Amino acid sequence: MDAAEDPENIAKVRAVNAGGTRNIAQVCKKLDCKMMYISTDYVFNGQGTQPWQPDCKDYAPLNVYGQTKLEGELAVANTLEKYFIVRIAWVFGKNGSNFIKTMLNVGKKHDTVRVVSDQIGTPTYTLDLARLLVDMAESEKYGYYHATNEGGYISWYDFTCEIYKQAGYATRVVPVTTAEYGLSKAARPFNSRLDKSKLAENGFQPLPAWQDALQRYLKEIDF
C-alpha cells in the first residue's frame, strides 16, 4: 500500500491493477466468459459516516492503490457485460500477513498498544468470501457488490480489543486518532463502511459476523 506511493513504483502498480486487469477483461470478452474482479473501498474518498453503496459512482481515490484499482474496475465494466466487481475491506486469511497476525505479535511483546479509533469499517475473512464468490460465479446476477463480514461497523481499536479478548491476551489497548498515531505514505480512509444489502437482494448469503469469523480464524493459525 505505502510502497505504491513511491514514484518509482507507480507505473508498476498501474500495470498490474489497471493494465493487467484490462488484458484479462479483453480475453474474457473474446471467450465470452464471466469475470470476477476483487476491488476495494479505496475507490471512494473515505469521508462521511454513511455506508458506501455498491453502485455509487462518486469515485475519489485517496491514493495510488485506490486510483489504480478504480482504473481496473472501469476496465472491467467498460469491456464486459458479464462481470462481478466485488469490493472488500480489512482482509484477513490464513496465508500472508494481515492486521490480526500483526496485532497478535505486537501483543506478545508489549503490555500496551496504541490503535486508531477513527477509521471505521468491517473485516473480511477470505474463507467466507471465497464461498460467496463461488455462489456468485455460478449465477448470472452481474454487477457491483460489497462483501465484508456482517456484525456491525467497528474501528481498528474495536477490532484489536476483540482480537485480544478471543486470544486471551491481557494487553491494554489505547485508542488514538489517526493524527495522533502518525500519517503513513498512503492516506487511509476514515469511512470504510460498505453497504452489503445488495447481496441478500440478489439471493446471496451474506458473510457471517466478523466476531464469528475471527473465532474460526484464530483456530486455524498458530500464535
Listing of model-derived features with the role each one plays in the protein:
Residues 29, 60-84:
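Active-site Tyr-X1-5-Lys
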Residues 74-121, 127-128, 135:
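NAD(P)-dependent short-chain dehydrogenase/reductase
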Residues 190-223:
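C-terminal amphipathic/interface module of NAD(P)-dependent oxidoreductases
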Residues 22-62:
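Conserved Rossmann-fold NAD(P)-dependent oxidoreductase catalytic core, especially the SDR/UDP-sugar
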Residues 132, 139-184, 190-191, 210:
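Mid/C-terminal beta-alpha module of Rossmann-like enzyme folds, strongest
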Residues 1-16:
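NAD(P)H-binding glycine-rich loop region in Rossmannoid oxidoreductase-like domains
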Residues 21-24, 73, 133:
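Conserved internal alpha-helix within the Rossmann fold of NAD(P)-dependent oxidoreductases
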Residues 12-23, 67-68:
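Glycine-rich NAD(P)-binding loop of the Rossmann-fold in SDR/ketoreductase-type enzymes
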